[in-house]
Amino acid sequence: MFNDMPVFDYEDIQLIPNKCIINSRSEADTSVRLGNYTFKLPVIPANMQTIIDETIAEQLARDGYFYIMHRFDEQGRKPFIQRMHEQQLIASISVGVKDYEYDFVSSLKEDAPEFITIDIAHGHADSVIKMIKHIKAELPETFVIAGNVGTPEAVRELENAGADATKVGIGPGKVCITKVKTGFGTGGWQLAAVRWCAKAARKPIIADGGIRTHGDIAKSIRFGATMVMIGSLFAGHIESPGKMVEIDGQSFKEYYGSASEYQKGEHKNVEGKKILLPTKGHLADTLTEMKQDLQSSISYAGGRELESLRRVNYVIVKNSIWNGDSI
């Protein structure tokens, strides 16, 4: 089975164009439906502390984008849900699987969030299955995203437990070092893992990690993802929560993994690292550029909406796309 499976990553794939049927790229519809809601783009800023905070979450929700709030301000989650609902905005939070999280979930019955993401590094676990069942029993209307996983077996088990979507990606992210520290993961074959998992899935797949260019979003959708979670491309903006650092007159923003010692506050079971990214412009400008690039992708696919990307052919061109090019 494994030996027969094609193994490739984003840089190994080129999508093949179809005849364009729209007069302008602006006619292409990049919206996507997840649960009972429609969002402007199939992208999610990673639920990491240097990517998203409450201010960014509120702005994304107000502007029609999906978001997932990180889980590292545990006491602030319930007030956050309340504030979002007071503004008629969707609430989307993250939980772990520790014992106290069960009481927290039960406490949300009176003001349940629209989305909960169970967010742990190795999501194919009895602890995750147990938490999915608990959330579904306590908050049956809440859309549950579970992860992270990297195999069809994991997707099926989490879906069977009640997950409404699964997040695929073990260690392909820019600040994740799981594959180096443990020898396990989808780093280097993340796109093939998305394809593999999507073929087994009956519910939405969220591709998480390894996205380095806007074209990778289109490739993720081609191989079965409904949404794409992105870290590094969303890090380093003026609004980003990461700490600003100045070196030789140039400003940088910190970006670190959720399993890094900087996140944990201790050097224990570290599977993440910290990097500095040159400060970018505003987040809204990046989202606009992503939309425009995705509209171009749809036009090359010969369609009018994201679904057309799933029907294009592709070629595997091992490590030759870049050919010395850079953006």
UniProtKB/Swiss-Prot annotation:
Example of a GO MF term: GMP reductase activity
EC number in record: 1.7.1.7
Keywords from the named record: NADP, Oxidoreductase
GO cellular component, one term: cytosol
Location of the active site: C176
Domain of life: Bacteria
Annotated Gene3D superfamilies: Aldolase class I
PROSITE patterns found in the cross-reference section: IMP_DH_GMP_RED
Binding positions (NADP(+)): 205-228
Function: Catalyzes the irreversible NADPH-dependent deamination of GMP to IMP. It functions in the conversion of nucleobase, nucleoside and nucleotide derivatives of G to A nucleotides, and in maintaining the intracellular balance of A and G nucleotides.
Family: Belongs to the IMPDH/GMPR family. GuaC type 2 subfamily.
PANTHER family attached to this UniProt entry: GMP REDUCTASE (PTHR43170:SF5)
HAMAP family in the record: GMP_reduct_type2
Name of protein: GMP reductase
The organism of origin for this protein: Streptococcus equi subsp. zooepidemicus (strain H70)
Lineage start: Bacteria, Bacillati, Bacillota, Bacilli, Lactobacillales
